[in-house]
Amino acid sequence: MISRSMKIRNSLLLVLTALIWGVAFVAQSKGGDAVGALSFNCIRSIIAGIVLLPVIKLLDALGYGSKKPAASQEKKTLVTGGICCGLALFLASTAQQIGITMGTEPGKAGFLTACYILLVPVFGLFLKKKCGFNIWRGVVIAVVGLYFLCMNGSISFETSDLMTLLCAVLFSFHILIIDHFSPLVDGVRMSCIQFFTCGIVGIIPMFIFDMGHSISGISEWLTLFADADAWIAILYAGVMSSGVGYTLQIVGQNGINPTVASMLMSLESVFSVLAGVVILKQFLTVRETVGCVLIFAAIIIAQLPAGKVKAENVNEEQGQADL
């Protein structure tokens, strides 16, 4: 068990993670359009892994590497956790990009992807991870809020949406895998292994689908990187969204109920909309504003201790009886 102050710190780390992911949405979109989705995911992951190598050395030198593996079993657990996280991350991000490429609208893609906040507690039941009533109530409210925020009122379902929904399933697995391994190993080290795994696994599909597996195809693919905007997007996504964001996720999830963690990270949708307002001078509609308010309310409700709510209910009943 970790202390309450540590839980608050880790919750704030997950909110910061959502903020980084939300703001990085524009960079990810531009980078994927410039060099191809598979290339973008592969390169950003490898960059993130490289960036974390000196970070690990620095943390060890400063004495913050508290879970540096000593025994062979600890190293095995670290490598296993990193590889499992990397495979789940690769499959989830690839499924999401394929769904968007097949035609899922960005708003619907955001909603379907964020449905992992509903899937995590459901899958967690099979792993004997119980959730209190407040958490379930918060999940339902958050899903409604996400619908208002991301959807335009259409409820049609296309084939591409199935791929995006698969992405939500895979991200649920990713969150639960992190929940299992994060208390056992050093989060930064596991994140580093995760990114190298994701990047290396992504090389083959990148070569087949983006490069065209021919000399001329590779030459044409290389010319895409002459665009400075492409590199800016890749570097930002690699360093911030991946290197910083996913590492904060692994560190922040330690000791946090995975369902609550998924709800905190679903703030990515809210921050992406707010970033559009601040950076791109867009405007929030009434529908989007209601969605943001519902998501924030859901997160607050999910954090309330069940005992506190019961006590409040008892006090209310006593007050009514006195009247």
Residue ranges and their predicted role:
Residues 18, 43, 109-115, 178-200, ...:
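Helix-helix packing/entry segments at the starts of transmembrane helices
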